[in-house]
Amino acid sequence: MSDYLVKALAYDGMARVYAAVTTETIKEAQRRHDTWSVSSAALGRTMTGTLFLGAMQKEDQKITVKIEGDGPIGPIVADSNAQGQIRGYVTNPHVHFSELNEAGKLDVRRGVGTSGMLSVVKDLGFGENFTGQTPIVSGEIGEDFTYYLATSEQINSSVGVGVLVNPDDTIEAAGGFMLQLLPGATDEIIDEIEKNLMALPTVSRMIEAGETPESILAKLAGGEDKLQILEKIPVSFECNCSKERFGSAIISLGKEEIRSMIEEDHGAEAECHFCRNTYDFSEEELKTLYEEAK
C-alpha cells in the first residue's frame, strides 16, 4: 500500500486530526542511509513528526526539523512540505542496543538523549523564515513534538509516532497521528479525547495490523461517523538535490578552495546528506566553476 496522510476534523469541529502511514517512506530512508534499529526508529519518528508539521503549512512553504540530543545518534534532520514530500538523515546511522527499554521497545530515548534541543525552521517563502526551539523533554520524539507545539506555537496537541523494525533492520511498519485542540473545546471534549488517547494501541502495531490513516483517525475520534475528512495527501521520500545545486555550493566556497580541489584532487565528489546521492565533478567542470567564483 502506498503511503498517505489524511487530515480531518473531529469532536464537532473542535479538534484538527492527522494520521499517516509512512512505512514505504521510512523503508526508503533506511535503505538509503543503512540505518540500524535504534537509528531507524529515531529517524522514522522524526520524519513522520516533520511530515505532520509540513502538512500544516501553506502550499509553497517548507519546514525543517532538527533534533539535537546528547545521545549517540547525534543530530537528526528532516524536512517536509505541504505536498507530503519528506526527506531526512541521522548523523550516526549505526546505533543499536541489545537491551530493550522498560516498555519492551527499542530504546530511542537512550539513542537520542534526554538533554538537547528540538529546532523548527519554517521557510515561509519570499526569503522569510520563522524559527522555533524547545528543549528535548523525553527523547522519545513524539512527546518532544507535542511539547514544541504547546510551547512554541501555543497549540495543545498530542503527537504519536512509531516505527516497527524487524530483527534484520528492515522496516515492518511506520506512521503516526497528531491531534490539535481548536479554540472553544470544552472540558467534556477534552475528557473524551484523553479517554480515546488512553485506549489507542501503539501506532506501529496498529499499522502492522493493517490499520489505515482513516481507521486510526476513527479510533482517535471515537467513531468513523465523528470524522469530517478534509484531505488525503500522498506521502513519499523525495529529495530535491541536484548537480547544479552542488555546483552552486562549490562556487560559494571561493576560488582558493576550488583551486586546491583542482590542483590536489583533480576533481571532487559531493554527497547529499539527505539521500546519499553522489555527484562527481571533473577537473574541467571545476575549472568552469572556478571562473564563476569570486
From Swiss-Prot:
SUPFAM superfamilies recorded: Hsp33 domain (SSF64397), HSP33 redox switch-like (SSF118352)
Gene name in the database record: hslO
Source organism of this protein record: Listeria monocytogenes serovar 1/2a (strain ATCC BAA-679 / EGD-e)
A Gene Ontology BP annotation from the UniProt entry: protein refolding
Entry keywords, A to Z: Chaperone, Cytoplasm, Disulfide bond, Redox-active center, Zinc
Similarity remark: Belongs to the HSP33 family.
InterPro entries cross-referenced by the UniProt entry: Heat_shock_Hsp33, Heat_shock_Hsp33_C, Heat_shock_Hsp33_N
A GO term, aspect molecular function: unfolded protein binding
Signal peptide positions on this chain: none
Compartments where located: Cytoplasm
Any GO CC annotation of this UniProt entry: cytoplasm
Official protein name in the record: 33 kDa chaperonin
Keyword Zinc among record annotations: yes
